[in-house]
Amino acid sequence: MNDRKTTKDFDQDLLHLFDQYVHGGIDRRGFLDRAAKYAVGGVTAAMLLDQLSPQFAEAQQVKPDDNRLKTERVSYPSPNGNAKTGGYLVRPANATGKLPGILVVHENRGLNPHIEDIARRLALDNFMAFAPDALATLGGYPGDEEKAREDFVAAANWLKTRPDCTGKIGAVGFCYGGGMVNTLATQMPDLAAAVPFYGNQPSAEDTARIKSPMLIHYAENDQITTRGPAFEEALKAAHVDYQMYTYKGTQHGFNNDTTPRYDPDAAKLAWTRTVEFFNKRLR
């Protein structure tokens, strides 16, 4: 990965443009048209898009066939006739007793190898990690947000009631998933720990319903972060037990080691805090 691009290789406005593309604000053609002015020195807009896009194989930290883990594809009922929804379940191979569970909520393009890798990392820290693909039944993103929320709540309840789970569960999510973790915290009073990475914030009215302790991670160069202070005021007003960190010089997606927006130092610190938080709240 030493020869891969970093955020220093790209104009900040291009990074914001890519963020719009990832979140559905513009389509591929719109990105290419607007990115053309940054394509210099023989580099095309299409090449810039490729450089900014995930490289899953290069960033894998834990192999899918790691013999320390037990992995399986599972399905669980999607509520209100939304059909079956699948997911990726990972446990330590040598686990002998019940484990606390962690719901791993994907970004806005659905379950992918990076999120599966995140689940494996958590399992190596002796958690049962479940990464549902809750957008699959909705035809991808954007879809019906209410149905997506219902599917993630169903996934959390499915995980919590497994006979090999202690019944204590947390949730971690990234981007779209960070916003969904915030939503789950407003909807699930029994959620024992919530960790949103750069996720959209709930309203002050919804924040007042949060019972879960929260660990909140933001990137400095991210429009979502500008709404962080209002969210923090709502958390304080609701007497929520929370910690909030903004990582200097980082971009939206700084924890995702498959793209140039990855910041290894910030990601390491944020992940260390995350695992410590789950150990404290779920054990």
List PLM regions with ranges:
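Short beta-strand element of the alpha/beta-hydrolase
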Residues: 98-107
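Primarily recognizes the serine-hydrolase "nucleophile elbow" in alpha/beta-hydrolase
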Residues: 153-211
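N-terminal cap/lid segment of alpha/beta-hydrolase-fold proteins
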Residues: 59-95
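N-terminal export signals
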Residues: 19, 28-54
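N-terminal secretory signal peptides
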Residues: 1-30
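Short amphipathic alpha-helix adjacent to the substrate-entry channel of hydrolases
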Residues: 113-132
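Short beta-strand/loop motif that positions the catalytic acidic residue
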Residues: 216-218
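Alpha/beta-hydrolase active-site loop
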Residues: 114, 140-163
